[in-house]
A protein has these predicted regions:
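Conserved active-site "lid/cap" helical segment
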Residues: 1-71, 75, 82, 166-178, ...
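Condensing-enzyme catalytic core mediating Claisen C-C bond formation in acyl metabolism
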Residues: 1-26, 145-146, 150, 231-296, ...
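N-terminal extracellular/periplasmic Venus flytrap/periplasmic-binding protein-like
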Residues: 11, 23, 27-32, 43, ...
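Active-site nucleophile and cofactor-binding loops and adjacent substrate-binding regions
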Residues: 64, 83-92, 251-255, 281, ...
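Active-site-proximal alpha-helical scaffold in enzymes
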Residues: 86-118, 171-200, 261-268, 333-334, ...
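Flexible glycine-/small-residue-enriched beta->alpha junction loops
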Residues: 111-169
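Active-site pocket-lining segment
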Residues: 168, 204-206, 212, 282-353
Length: 401
C-alpha cells in the first residue's frame, strides 16, 4: 500500500478579530502560505502537484467560488494545478489533509497541497432575496460564525443552539463546572506563552506584511490572540450566553484569521524530490453526535480511528485537541480517560490561547502536532476537533523516522 507523508507545512500568525490580519483578504492569506511553502522546497517540481485542497468554513465573502483554486493561482502555482475547497466547518482543514492523504494512498496523487484558511474578521453580512414582491421583511445575517438562513425543519428537529450554547449544554450534561473550565483556559494561556517564549512556533510561522495607515506597512510575526490572565480575572468575566451559565469569553476560543498550507507526498515523491517527511499520515475518521452537544464529537471520532488502527490512546505521545471551548475540551478528556492537565495534550497551548480561524484550525493542529512529535522523538500524534452541527474528526500521525 502506498504511504502518505506530511512533508512540511507553514502557517500565518493567527490574528484576532478585527486585528492584525483583518486587512488581508482570505484568498491572499492562503496564497501567502502556498507561496512560502513553494519557496521553502525548491527541489519540488510544483507543476506536478496533483491538487490543492483547502478547508474553509464560510465561503460567503471573498473566500467564495473555490478559494483553494484562487489561492493556488495567486500563490504562483502553475495554471494546470487544480484546486478544491472543502467545507466540514471547523474540521475543514483537517478534512482537507485527510482527503489529500487518501488520494495518495489510493494512488491517485503523488503531491498534494492541503490546508485551510479563514478570515472571520472579513466575513460578510448576507441577505436573502425577497419571497414576495415589494416585501419589506428582509433579514440580514452575520456570517462570522454560526447559523444563518435556517431551515425550519432543522430547527424543529435538532434546534439551532449557538456554539456557546452548545458548550453550555455540554457543561451541564457532563458536569464541567466553571472552575474546571477556567483552570483549563489558564493552562492553555500559560502553555502558549511559554511556547512563544521558547520559539516553538517559529518553524511553522511565516510573517505577513499588512497595510498600516495610508501608505505604510508592518510585519506580523507572532500569534496575536494569547493574553496574560489569571484565575481571578477569568472568574470575574460574565457568562453572557445563558443565565447562571459557565461559558465566558475567557474560557472559549477566539474569533480569528489565519491560513495554513501543508505538503502531502507519496513515498515515490519523497524520494524523487529528496524530501524529509515530518510524519506519516496513518488514518482519519469522522463521527456524528447530537448537534446540541457538538463539542463531544472528538470522542466517537477518536474511538473510531483508534479501533480502525488497532491502537490504544495510551500509545499516543502527543494530542492536539482543538479547544473550541474549555467545557467541551474537559468533557472530551474525561470521556477519553485522560487527565484534564495531561502534559502531552496541547503542550503548547490551544485555541483558547492561540485562536480558532475555523477552516484553518485543523491543518494548524496537524502541523503543530507533527512538529511536537518530532521534537519529542515520539511515535504517534493525534489531532482531533469538534465540529458545528454535531460532528467530530480525528487524524493520526506516526513518526516517519
Amino acid at each position: 500500500m502506498t504511504v502518505a507523508y506530511l512533508v512540511a507545512g507553514v502557517r500565518t500568525p493567527i490574528g484576532r478579530y478585527a486585528g492584525a490580519l483583518a486587512g488581508v483578504r482570505p484568498d491572499d492569506l492562503a496564497a501567502h502560505v502556498i507561496r512560502e511553502l513553494v519557496a521553502r522546497h525548491p527541489s519540488v517540481d510544483w507543476a506536478r502537484v496533483d491538487d490543492v485542497l483547502l478547508g474553509c468554513a464560510n465561503q460567503a465573502g471573498e473566500d467564495n467560488r473555490n478559494v483553494a483554486r484562487m489561492a493556488a493561482l495567486l500563490g504562483g502555482l502553475p495554471e494546470q494545478v487544480p484546486g478544491s475547497t472543502i467545507n466540514r466547518l471547523c474540521g475543514s482543514g483537517l478534512d482537507a489533509l485527510a482527503t489529500a492523504a487518501r488520494a495518495v494512498v489510493a494512488g491517485e496523487a503523488e503531491l498534494v497541497v492541503a490546508g485551510g484558511v479563514e478570515s472571520m474578521s472579513r466575513a460578510p453580512f448576507v441577505m436573502p432575496k425577497a419571497t414576495s414582491a415589494y416585501s419589506r421583511s428582509a433579514e440580514v445575517y452575520d456570517t462570522t460564525i454560526g447559523w444563518r438562513l435556517v431551515n425550519p425543519l432543522m430547527k424543529a428537529g435538532w434546534g439551532v443552539d449557538s456554539m456557546p450554547e452548545t458548550a453550555e449544554n455540554v457543561a451541564a450534561e457532563y458536569g464541567v463546572d466553571r472552575v474546571a473550565q477556567d483552570e483549563f483556559a489558564l493552562r492553555s494561556q500559560q502553555r502558549a506563552a511559554k511556547a512563544q517564549a521558547d520559539g516553538r512556533f517559529a518553524e511553522e510561522i511565516v510573517a505577513v506584511t499588512v497595510p498600516e495607515g495610508r501608505r505604510g506597512t508592518r510585519l506580523v510575526e507572532v500569534d496575536e490572540h494569547p493574553r496574560e490572565t489569571s484565575l481571578e480575572k477569568l472568574a470575574a468575566l460574565p457568562t453572557p450566553f445563558r443565565a447562571g451559565g459557565t461559558v465566558t469569553a475567557g474560557n472559549s476560543s477566539g474569533v480569528n484569521d489565519g491560513a495554513v498550507a501543508l505538503l502531502v507526498a507519496s513515498e515515490a515523491a519523497v524520494a524523487r524530490y529528496h524530501l524529509t517527511p515530518l510524519a506519516r499520515i496513518a488514518g482519519a475518521a469522522a463521527a456524528g453526535v447530537p448537534p446540541r452537544i457538538m463539542g463531544v464529537g472528538p470522542v466517537p471520532a477518536t474511538r473510531k480511528l483508534l479501533d480502525r488502527l488497532g491502537v490504544g490512546l495510551d500509545a499516543v505521545d502527543v494530542i492536539e485537541l482543538n479547544e473550541a471551548f474549555a467545557a467541551q475540551s474537559v468533557a472530551v478528556l474525561r470521556e477519553l480517560g485522560l487527565p484534564e492537565d495531561a502534559e502531552h495534550v496541547n503542550p503548547n497551548g490551544g485555541a483558547i490561547a492561540l485562536g480558532h480561524p475555523l477552516g484553518a484550525s485543523g491543518a494548524r493542529l496537524a502541523l503543530t502536532a507533527a512538529l511536537e512529535l518530532r521534537r519529542r522523538g515520539g511515535r504517534r500524534a493525534l489531532a482531533t476537533m469538534c465540529i458545528g452541527v454535531g460532528q467530530g474528526i480525528s487524524l493520526m500521525l506516526e513518526s516517519a523516522a
